[in-house]
From Swiss-Prot:
One of its GO terms (cellular component) is cytoplasm. Residues 42-60 have a biased composition (Basic and acidic residues). This is Uncharacterized RING finger protein P8B7.23. InterPro entries: MAG2/RNF10, Znf_C3HC4_RING-type, Znf_RING, Znf_RING/FYVE/PHD, Znf_RING_CS. Residues 13-40 have a biased composition (Low complexity). One of its GO terms (biological process) is positive regulation of transcription by RNA polymerase II. A zinc finger (RING-type) spans 214-273. It is found in: Cytoplasm; Nucleus. Residues 1-95, 649-673 are annotated as: Disordered. It comes from Schizosaccharomyces pombe (strain 972 / ATCC 24843). One of its GO terms (molecular function) is zinc ion binding. SUPFAM superfamilies: RING/U-box.
């Protein structure tokens, strides 16, 4: 024990020997009856025989007060020794000394001890190695969305609610006229890179297969159409009215506050609930393609051979290559709207004069519609005048910007002239414009399309048939007119599809493409088609099996929909009625009919079939129904067969001593014997 420590039995004498003899934990302790109080000797013996309880609180409660003090002092001593041992081990590891009594109770040393030491007194010295793992960094800018039980994302990329998804959709399905001062190097190298919405001046849409009705007036072809960031199309007059019309909440707030209604500069899209601002909408130009063809299965289609140079995003007909004297087909640059390649480009560089001309066409269209409304209804919409004034202001601002940027436009014109002169020099060195060098052909991709920007291509088997017939892609004819057997649509461009079909590398991701399967019996020789006979027949069988499978799915879906409707309305599904078609000649035979000359057996069979009972609905009744009714008539008591009664009452010859049977008649109310 430590010096100066008080014993658990009370005040101890100054003599250490006597104190050690009285201390139960001391090795000099001598048990005797004199050392134990008489009153507690019996209790001490019983407590020594019993096993210690697990719970320390119950153990201390059962002990005398003096023994409780002894146990508490023992615990303090053990804890103190353990701390001293751990602190000494830590001091040895870090090179400190415990000679100073303050070092044992140093707070810093105790913190190190509690952090580095386990229950067994072992010390972790990894901090002395000066080794540390590099922190994990996420290479992606956006973290992955949380995993959900549903199979689709509710937000983020791929859900349709993310701005990037909408910009990718617009980038994949439309063409653009962009500002001449923008930087489009990323779009030339990567078709998936969307054009900045601020650089877009006009959106080009096909009037043949990209018409979108206005969600407000339901006009099939919107007037002075405008497109928002989300890709939805509206009439300019409808959109302006929608934005400027206050909502019920705004009117109520203005009435309560006693102020004017504040005009809101934005509204939510009625289709996708995305924010719409008037400054973010861009005009739309409806483009009509003279080469447009509506594809139908079983009809012929004219296919043109298109060419795309390696690394370029411009695909053009190979037959038009010799007529492009402006160099648009010989350069990888984005063409201007005046070049020949602008009709086949997805991104076109515009000019202020071009936009002024387009705005004037919109004003002319609005005036024509206003005149029609006045002739029909007596008045025109006031928003037509508002839109006309907005377009006139836009034209004036464009004219001012043209005057300010004369130097820049002059420089661009000089660059275009230099480019055209270089292309003319290059073309003049070539004797035959139709002959293309082998290096250019090796770097170019050839494919068939019905018309520009149609995204309709031949299936892989058809391409193999053509290559087997013509030898190589360079020998393909510029035009082919096969018969379409099947159209497979709904394929989206992705990395897999690009890896499989190299000629689709210029299409942006998310673009929808279709493949057609054609009948080449009138174009390709029969000897070539015989080599692919098994594959063609297999493809046709698969097509028929798919059609049957789709028909079964359609019928099943219709049946499930009907069942759901009947279950929601708590109605029972009606049972289809069986309609019996009868020949009037058989139902009403005439005297001169040919049935009179038939055999008696056939007549009997016909009579038996005609005599069968039928229900009031025209269906055939069961044969035993009539017999059952006859039995019931016999048992009702009102129709008695007296001949049968006489036979039963007459005595039989063989029965001499037998008792006669008595007949019970039910003609009266009670039975009489």
């Amino acid at each position: 024990m430590l010096n100066g420590e008080k014993s658990a039995l009370g005040e101890m004498p100054s003599n250490s020997n006597s104190s050690s003899k009285l201390n139960a934990k001391s090795p000099n302790f001598i048990p005797s009856s004199s050392n134990i109080p008489r009153s507690s000797a019996k209790t001490k013996e019983h407590s020594a025989d019993r096993k210690p309880h697990r719970n320390s609180e119950k153990k201390t409660q059962g002990m005398p007060r003096k023994n409780q003090q002894l146990a508490s002092s023992e615990r303090k001593t053990k804890n103190k020794k353990r701390l001293e041992k751990q602190s000494s081990a830590i001091a040895d590891s870090i090179g400190e000394s415990l000679d100073d009594p303050q070092t044992v109770y140093d707070e810093h040393l105790f913190d190190i001890l509690s952090a580095r030491t386990n229950k067994r007194g072992q010390i972790n010295l990894n901090h002395l190695l000066n080794f540390q793992f590099t922190p994990r960094t996420n290479s992606n800018a956006f973290s992955a969305p949380p995993r959900r039980s549903r199979g689709y994302n509710t937000y983020g990329q791929g859900s349709g609610h993310h701005p990037m998804d909408k910009s990718r959709y617009v980038n994949a399905n439309y063409r653009f006229v962009v500002s001449p001062i923008g930087d489009y190097q990323s779009q030339k190298l990567d078709p998936d890179s969307p054009v900045k919405w601020e650089d877009v001046w006009q959106v080009l849409c096909s009037s043949d297969f990209q018409l979108a009705a206005c969600p407000f007036c339901l006009e099939e072809k919107p007037v002075a159409a405008r497109m928002s960031r989300c890709g939805h199309v509206y009439c300019f007059s409808c959109l302006l009215r929608f934005v400027e019309t206050p909502t019920a909440a705004e009117v109520k707030a203005a009435e309560t506050s006693g102020t004017k209604i504040v005009k809101c500069g934005h509204r939510s899209c009625p289709i996708c609930w995305d924010s719409i601002r008037l400054r973010d909408v861009h005009p739309i130009r409806w483009v009509e393609d003279k080469e447009f063809q509506k594809l139908e299965e079983g009809k012929s289609v004219c296919l043109r051979l298109y060419q795309r140079n390696n690394g370029s995003i411009l695909a053009f007909p190979r037959s038009c290559r010799s007529f492009a004297l402006d160099g648009s087909f010989h350069s990888d640059e984005i063409p201007n709207f005046t070049m020949s390649g602008a009709a086949y480009a997805r991104i076109i560089i515009g000019s202020h004069d071009y936009m002024v001309q387009q705005h004037l066409l919109e004003i002319e269209q609005l005036q024509q519609i206003a005149a029609e409304d006045i002739s029909l209804y007596g008045s025109a919409d006031t928003y037509y005048e508002r839109i006309t004034q907005i377009l006139l202001d836009r034209i004036s601002s464009l004219s001012e910007s043209v005057n300010e940027q004369n130097i820049k436009s002059l420089q661009t014109d000089i660059d275009n002239l230099c480019l055209q002169s270089n292309s003319l020099k290059q073309l003049s060195e070539v004797d035959d414009l139709n002959d293309v060098s082998g290096s250019e052909i090796a770097d170019a991709y050839l494919f068939y399309q019905p018309f520009a920007h149609s995204h309709i291509y031949l299936s892989p088997l058809d391409i193999r048939i053509l290559k087997s017939a013509f030898g190589s892609y360079e020998n393909f004819p510029d035009e082919l007119v096969p018969r379409v057997e099947r159209i497979s649509s709904g394929h989206l461009v992705n990395s897999e599809l690009r890896q499989r079909f190299k000629y689709m590398a210029h299409l942006p991701e998310g673009c929808e493409v279709a493949f057609i399967e054609c009948d080449w019996s009138k174009i390709i020789p029969k000897e070539v088609l015989l080599t692919f006979k098994s594959e063609i027949s297999k493809r046709r069988k698969q097509r028929k099996a798919q059609e049957m499978r789709e028909e079964r799915y359609r019928q099943r879906a219709e049946r499930d929909t009907e069942e759901q409707i009947y279950s929601e309305l708590n109605m029972q599904r009606p049972v289809p009625k069986t309609v019996v078609h009868e020949d009037p000649a058989e139902a009403f035979p005439t005297l001169g009919s040919h049935h009179q000359f038939e055999s008696t057996d056939e007549v009997n069979t016909d009579e038996s079939t005609l005599s069968t009972a039928k229900t009031v609905w025209g269906t055939r009744a069961l044969a035993n129904i009539q017999n059952d009714t006859d039995d019931q008539d016999d048992l009702d008591g009102w129709k008695v067969d007296w001949d049968k009664v006489a036979q039963l009452s007459a005595p039989s010859k063989n029965s001499k001593n037998k008792k006669k049977k008595k007949l019970v008649l039910l003609s009266t109310g009670a039975a009489h014997r």
